From Swiss-Prot:
Positions annotated to bind Zn(2+) 5: C451, C456, C488, H491
Compositional bias of kind Basic and acidic residues: 74-85, 94-109, 116-132, 829-843, 915-928
Gene: Phf14
GO CC, one annotated term: chromosome
UniProt keyword annotations, A-Z: Chromosome, Coiled coil, Cytoplasm, Metal-binding, Nucleus, Phosphoprotein, Repeat, Repressor, Transcription, Transcription regulation, Zinc, Zinc-finger
Effect of a null allele: Death just after birth due to respiratory failure with lungs showing interstitial hyperplasia. Abnormalities are also observed in other organs such as kidney and lung. Mesenchymal fibroblasts exhibit increased proliferation and increased PDGFRA expression. Conditional knockout in germinal center (GC) B cells results in reduced GC response in the spleen following immune challenge, with fewer and smaller GCs observed.
Zinc finger regions, C2HC pre-PHD-type: 375-408
Polar residues composition-biased segments: 281-290, 930-941
Binding-site positions, Zn(2+) 2: C332, C335, C367, C370
Residues with PTM Phosphotyrosine: Y199
Protein residues bound to Zn(2+) 9: C879, C882, C908, C911
Annotated binding of Zn(2+) 1, by residue: C315, C318, H340, C343
Identification of the protein by name: PHD finger protein 14
Length: 941
């Protein structure tokens, strides 16, 4: 009887538990529903009902203890559930991904919606019937669990021994488990994820909320039976089904709790400890998976940020890379060009919603050229890259050209459109030549601007200057009428030019790769949307162009050179290419169009004017005359060459006969002198030798002749080249002022195209002599160890004084060694016994050997001979003749730099005047001797 009475108290105990929990079957939001892990006791009890009936005879004290422990256990679990829910809620995305992985591993497919609804209705009917049966059984005195109750799903810690079929598991009701940490995944979690700082909606490409399945356990734990999986699938169908399922769990949990109350205290404690371990394992796995998910999100964000940093947007107008909210750098979705909103005149309210404004932007942006569907050519420069603006006449110009070229105006200053070119003077087209254009055929196209530094005469195109980083803009704080200015390379800031040049190169490389990368990144739907939007813009632009009023143009048609249009030049070059005409063989003559000797203009710019037409026909007539004249001159040249060959033969014969006569004359002169001396001895008087018997007077060579003695009295009529040893093309022979040899212009190394310019203070030397000077300098620099190293060596390399060592005084009456000759005029002479030496070509090896024997002394310049002031090698120059030093400013006229140039020598003004006086004195003496000889010849006749 006692046992039966105790057994009857199970129902009030379960009711008291429900009242203590404030449970309401209509609202189960206070609980987190999961697997029936708490019904393990009932599951075990169902396996052995006799054991439950045997345990029903426990004392009242044991029941009270059990009730208190259950209450404490429930309170602890509620606190743990709240804490775990707060930790798990930010990781909804993680749980969803884990559920998706489990579904892929299990290979389960969701059932159709209709089948699920039918199964739900059947389960609800069964639940109602079982609820009524359980109520009636609880009211009766029976202490065992009903046989119709299905077996509970066991947790992984307690293995089950019952096996059920799939149909039984589908119809199996769910159990109420208080120890299951299972958060409710509703769509409120989407808002929480969006509120997170590191959340990006584009990273959730694999998240499909419509097919989300709610899991019963974490991915780290073992899955339950098939019945559990079916229950989980049912729970993912909607919020209403979740509430119904949780309500069913409540109905089926009451008999399980009653059966659990009949167990021993030891078994209850062991089960509680096992569940606690399970709970801690769940929390650990959830925390680990949450940390892994956070690391993955951080890695994705870093990769995305690094990818964005690799493509820093640069404005193609100002070459700046600062993008602010008030002035963003926008990118065209068609051509990929990037520009600031302010630099392009984009309206921030209507046009600034572009593809690069945000990662989730929906409105594409296009530049004006893409909207009109054209590939424009600038009217002001020959370059084709960059961003364009349309003029009021339908032409196109670079926006940077319109900003920097004077005379260009805008209809709307804020939007920088339309561009007006009629206010600019047409004479500027092709007036100046660009100094930066790589192709000289485009140097006079468009309009060139000048350097803004004072009186600088450098001219260049705007876009050519932009390539070199020479464009500048005044600060916004400065109130300047024209804030855009440009400098040449000489006057531009070096650091400013460096970073602008760097940004320009980066912009060019990015624009080439951006289109390919954007096509790869964009999906076909996004690309189709962009193309559709572009077609809409082009249709609007075509409509606006047809309805746009005509721009004002001057009444008189202004002529403009055809060569000033870059597009026309390209088309003409293309035409020449198709016709098979090479455009490289025609030199570009951009010289000034000055009049020729006969008063006719040599060249006129092509234009649609009557003046150019007259010039064109006149040029054709002149071309015919020139061709006829060339044919005549060619015939004359052939005749003269034949005559020259005959004359060369006669000349050689005459030279041979002249030498014979000179030898005979010398013999006769010596015989006459002997006879005349004999007559003097006979008479005993010293007789004057007649002029006819006198030898030709030996005279000193002038300084202009370089101090060399003539080897023969034979006049030199034809000169031979020192390299090819031929005497043709006498007009192309060039005299070296150092070695006194003649050279053809084409025989030199490197060949010359024209005669070098000589002045009174400078002269020219051949490459062989110049190489000798450079070898002298190398030997000198090898011996010197100067403190200022590089600067001193560079300066001395450029100095032309490098042939005669200063410590060796010139020796009179001796010819100096040719390998050590000076660049100045030589003062040494050849004695009479050595004057018949033949001139032998010099060899490099002998010269170098002599140089090694006689190294040149160090050239130290300390005092100016004019002002007697001190100086050094930086501000003094030494004369090659008198070896005196002069300040640059003490010369007449004063100079700012050294007058010496590489390959040329230099003498002071005094030496130049003295040499001219000596030449005059020698000429006077020669004339006097000729007059004396004439006087002596006349009385004999």
């Amino acid at each position: 009887m006692d046992r039966s009475s105790k057994r009857r108290q199970v129902k009030p105990l379960a009711a008291s538990l429900l009242e203590a929990l404030d449970y309401d079957s209509s609202d189960d939001s206070d609980f987190k529903v999961g697997d029936a892990s708490d019904s393990e006791g009932s599951g075990n009890g169902s396996e052995d009902p006799s054991k439950d009936s045997g345990e029903g005879s426990c004392s009242d004290s044991e029941e009270n203890i059990l009730e208190e422990e259950l209450n404490e256990d429930i309170q602890v679990k509620e606190e743990q559930l709240k804490n775990s829910t707060e930790e798990i809620m930010p990781s909804d995305k993680q749980l969803i991904k884990m559920e998706k992985k489990e579904e892929e591993e299990n290979g389960e497919r969701p059932r159709k919606k209709k089948e699920k609804e039918k199964e739900k209705e059947k389960e609800r009917e069964k639940d109602k019937e079982k609820a009524t049966v359980s109520d009636s059984a609880a009211a009766s005195a029976a202490g065992t669990t009903p046989a119709t109750s299905p077996p509970a799903v066991t947790s992984p810690s307690v293995p089950t021994t019952t096996t059920t079929t799939t149909e039984e598991q589908v119809s199996e009701p769910k159990k109420w488990n208080l120890r299951r940490n299972r958060p409710l995944l509703d769509f409120v979690s989407m808002e929480e994820l969006n509120a997170m700082d590191d959340y990006d909606s584009e990273d959730d490409n694999d998240w499909r909320p419509t097919v989300v399945k709610r899991k019963g356990r974490s991915a780290s734990q073992k899955e339950g039976s098939d019945g559990d999986n079916e229950d989980d699938d049912d729970e993912g169908s909607g919020s209403e089904e979740d509430e119904n399922d949780e309500g069913n769990d409540e109905d089926h949990s009451s008999p399980a709790s009653e059966a659990g109350g009949k167990k021993k205290r030891s078994k209850v404690l062991s089960r509680n400890s096992a569940d606690d371990e399970e709970l801690t394992n769940d929390s650990l796995t959830l925390s680990q998976s949450k940390s892994n998910e956070d690391s993955l999100i951080l890695e994705k964000s870093q990769n995305w940020s690094s990818q964005k940093m690799d493509h820093i947007l640069i404005c193609c107008v100002c070459l700046g890379d600062n993008s602010e909210d008030a002035d963003e750098i926008i990118q065209c979705d068609n051509c990929g060009i990037t520009v600031h909103e302010g630099c392009y005149g984009v309206d921030g309210e209507s046009d600034s919603i572009m593809s690069s404004a945000s990662e989730n932007s929906t409105e594409p942006w296009f530049c004006d050229a893409c909207k009109c569907g054209v590939s424009p050519s600038c009217e002001l420069c020959p370059n084709q890259d960059g961003i364009f603006k349309e003029t009021d006449a339908g032409r196109w110009v670079h926006i940077v050209c319109a900003l920097y070229v004077p005379g260009v105006a805008f209809g709307d200053i804020d939007k920088l459109r339309p561009v007006t070119l009629t206010e600019m003077n047409y004479s500027k087209y092709g007036a100046k030549e660009c100094s930066f254009c790589e192709d000289p055929r485009f140097a006079r196209t468009g309009v060139c601007i000048s350097c803004d530094a004072g009186m600088c005469r450098a001219y260049f195109h705007v876009t050519c200057a932009q390539k070199e980083g020479l464009l500048s803009e005044a600060a916004a704080e400065e109130d300047i009428a024209d804030p855009f200015f440009a400098y040449c390379k000489q006057h531009a800031d070096r650091l400013d030019r460096k970073w602008k040049r760097k940004n320009y190169l980066a912009l060019q490389s990015y624009c080439k790769m951006s289109l390919q990368e954007r096509e790869k990144q964009l999906s076909p739907e996004a690309q189709a949307r962009i193309n559709a939007r572009l077609q809409q813009y082009r249709a609007k632009a075509e409509l606006a162009r047809s309805t746009r009023p005509q721009a004002w143009v001057p009444r008189e048609k202004l002529p403009r050179p055809l060569t000033s249009s870059a597009s026309a030049i390209r088309k003409l070059m293309r035409k020449a290419e198709l016709m098979g005409i090479s455009t490289d063989i025609f030199p570009v003559d951009n010289s000034d169009t000055s009049s020729s000797v006969d008063g006719r203009r040599k060249h006129k710019q092509p234009a649609l004017t009557a003046d150019f037409v007259n010039y064109y026909f006149e040029r054709n007539m002149r071309m015919i005359q020139i061709q006829e004249n060339m044919a005549e001159q060619k015939n004359i040249k052939d005749k003269l060459e034949n005559e020259q060959e005959k004359l060369h033969v006669e000349y050689n014969k005459l030279c041979e006969s002249l030498e014979e006569l000179q030898n005979l004359n010398g013999k006769l002169r010596s015989e006459g002198q002997g006879i005349w001396a004999l007559l003097g001895r006979i008479t005993g008087q010293k007789l004057n030798v007649p002029a006819i018997l006198r030898a030709p007077k030996e005279r000193k060579p002038s300084k202009k002749e370089g101090g060399t003695q003539k080897t023969s009295a034979l006049p030199t009529v034809l000169y031979s080249c020192g390299i090819c040893k031929k005497n043709h093309d006498q007009h192309l022979l060039l005299l070296c002022d150092t070695c006194k040899l003649h050279y053809h212009l084409g025989c030199l190394d490197p060949p010359l195209t024209r005669m070098p310019r000589k002045t009174k203070n400078s002269y020219w030397q051949c490459s062989e002599c110049d190489q000798a000077g450079s070898s002298d300098m190398e030997a000198e620099m090898a011996m010197e160890t100067l403190p200022d190293g590089t600067k001193r060596s560079r300066r001395q390399i450029k100095e032309p004084v490098k042939f005669v060592p200063q410590d060796v005084p010139p020796e009179p009456k001796k010819i100096p060694i040719r390998n050590t000759r000076t660049r100045g005029r030589k003062r040494s002479f050849v004695p009479e016994e050595e004057k018949h030496e033949e001139r032998v070509p010099r060899e490099r090896r002998q010269r170098q050997s002599v140089l090694q024997k006689k190294p040149k002394a160090e050239d130290l310049r300390t005092e100016c001979s004019t002002c007697k002031g001190t100086g050094d090698n930086e501000n003094l120059v030494r004369c090659d003749e008198c070896r005196l030093c002069y300040h640059f400013g003490c010369l007449d006229p004063p100079l700012k730099k050294s007058p010496k140039q590489t390959g040329y020598g230099w003498i002071c003004q005094e030496c130049d005047s003295s040499s001219s006086k000596e030449d005059e004195n020698e000429a006077e003496k020669k004339n006097a001797s000729q007059e004396l000889s004439m006087e002596q010849k006349t009385p004999k006749k």
